[in-house]
Amino acid sequence: MIVFCRLKGLTSVLYSSQGIGFEICKKLGAVGVKIIAACRNESLGVQAVAKLHALGYDVEYHNIDLSNDASIARFTNGLSEHYRSIDILVNNAGIAYKINETRSYDEQAHAILTTNFFGTMRFTEAILPLLRKAKAPRIVNVSSQGGLLKILKSETLKERFTSCSTTQQLESLVNEYLTAVYDRTYGERGWPHANYGVSKLALNALTRILAKREAATNPGKNFLINACSPGFCDTELNHHKGKRTAEYGARTPAMLALLSETGPVAPTGKFFYNDAEINW
């Protein structure tokens, strides 16, 4: 069991307005963490912050669109003007489409990868300088078991994902997938049909890459970067088909955000489900 004990004087950034993201905000706010809630839908963001304020939590809202580089720059520049450091980053951004979606498969794949992977990666890279200034920074990437390696039909692709050592290599691999989608060869090349799964697989690989990079460039920093699956929860993202509550799904992300472990045994670059590490 991992105890929530990093309580005072921490500042967290969460991409959230409802569902699991909102419940993560509640769990962090309840232990005294200042929350900077960011999301694209301003109306939902303002409503979420009002609810959190009513609970007595220290929270502020900022608008950001992860599919827009200028929006990411405005947000991170604004943070740098007002905060010396950021202690926790929870990446909870994610879009998915209904089975009867009228957009083409190409359009869906492009939109999902743009937000769930490329946008999240660029946002994380932009905010890393502030995280590095914290005493014991944490990044939590909220992923999915739908993004485990087993979704790939090609052993070569599995090996390429696990051996990626730079974000540039990973970007190239994800762009290969999009190219295969556009020319209708993704199936024969070993890619799955589930573009949401590919976006989360890429996020899991990004987690490992960033964890290794930060451990190598900032040894002794106690910078922990992990990914997790909240499980199949009853949220807007899956059209309320999940069996778990959003509150239950927020448990593991909140646990990772508040990890107190230090030293060589502290988990970083790992994937968690039900509060425990599993293979990705």
PLM features per residue range, with description:
Residues A227-T235, H239-W280:
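C-terminal helical subdomain
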Residues V90, F123-I127, L131, L203-T207, ...:
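Hydrophobic positions on the long internal alpha-helix
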Residues R74-N77, E81, Y97-T114:
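Active-site Tyr-X3-Lys motif and surrounding loop/helix of classical short-chain dehydrogenase/reductase
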Residues M1-I36:
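Canonical Rossmann dinucleotide-binding motif of NAD(H)/NADP(H)-dependent dehydrogenases/reductases
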Residues V31-Q47:
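Conserved glycine-rich Rossmann-like NAD(P)H-binding loop of the short-chain dehydrogenase/reductase
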